[in-house]
């Protein structure tokens, strides 16, 4: 069974986000081994300097990279990523699994994004939209899209 992980910066703070993610975790059990790993978010002042932002991205990036599985296919969510359809995401998951890779790690950065080092590990740079969303909502949306991808691949009725 395929291992699918989300490695993200920060914790879900509101119960409604936690409940939404828990629902998709439950739904995904029949399709993959699903896990979410939260790495600590760096604290920054209200108006951080470029150097402070760069340092934050580097520290968070190191924490993320430590959690990427050996041989995993990495998909990083980033602003410059490619916008793809749900069907294309299903195809990425299928192609990765059929290619002999046993793990896909999806990466969600913190408020300032991802370090170049993290982005460079990615086989897919993915954008949810040209719009900006809170990272907590992006996590829920990604969980839903992963579930939808498995439904598409298996001919489930969830995707219309």
Residue ranges and their predicted role:
Residues 3, 102-106:
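Loop/turn-to-beta-strand initiation segments
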Residues 36, 74-76, 125:
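Conserved beta-strand scaffold positions in the cores of enzyme catalytic domains, especially
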Residues 12, 79-82, 110-113:
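Short glycine-rich anion-binding loops that position phosphate/pyrophosphate groups of nucleotides
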Residues 32, 71-72, 122:
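Short, well-ordered alpha-helix to beta-strand connector turns
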Residues 7, 35-37:
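General small-molecule cofactor/ligand-binding pocket signal
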Residues 1-28:
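N-terminal beta1-alpha1 ligand-phosphate binding loop
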Residues 40-102:
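S-adenosyl-L-methionine/SAH cofactor-binding core of RNA-modifying enzymes
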Residues 112, 116-160:
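Structured adenosyl-cofactor binding patch, chiefly the S-adenosyl-L-methionine
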């Amino acid at each position: 069974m395929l291992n699918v992980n989300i490695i993200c910066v920060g914790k879900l703070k509101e119960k409604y986000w936690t409940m939404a993610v828990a629902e998709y975790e439950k739904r995904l059990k029949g399709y993959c081994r699903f896990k979410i790993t939260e790495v600590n978010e760096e604290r920054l002042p209200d108006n951080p300097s470029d150097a402070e932002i760069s340092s934050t991205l580097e520290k968070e990036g190191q924490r993320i990279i430590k959690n990427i599985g050996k041989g995993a296919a990495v998909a990083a969510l980033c602003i410059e990523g490619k916008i793809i359809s749900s069907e294309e995401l299903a195809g990425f998951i299928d192609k990765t699994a059929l290619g002999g890779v046993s793990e896909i790690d999806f990466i969600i950065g913190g408020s300032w994004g991802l370090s170049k080092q993290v982005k460079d590990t990615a086989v897919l740079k993915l954008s949810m939209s040209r719009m900006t969303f809170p990272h907590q909502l992006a996590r829920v949306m990604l969980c839903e899209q992963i579930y939808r991808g498995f439904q598409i691949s298996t001919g489930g009725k969830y995707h219309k």
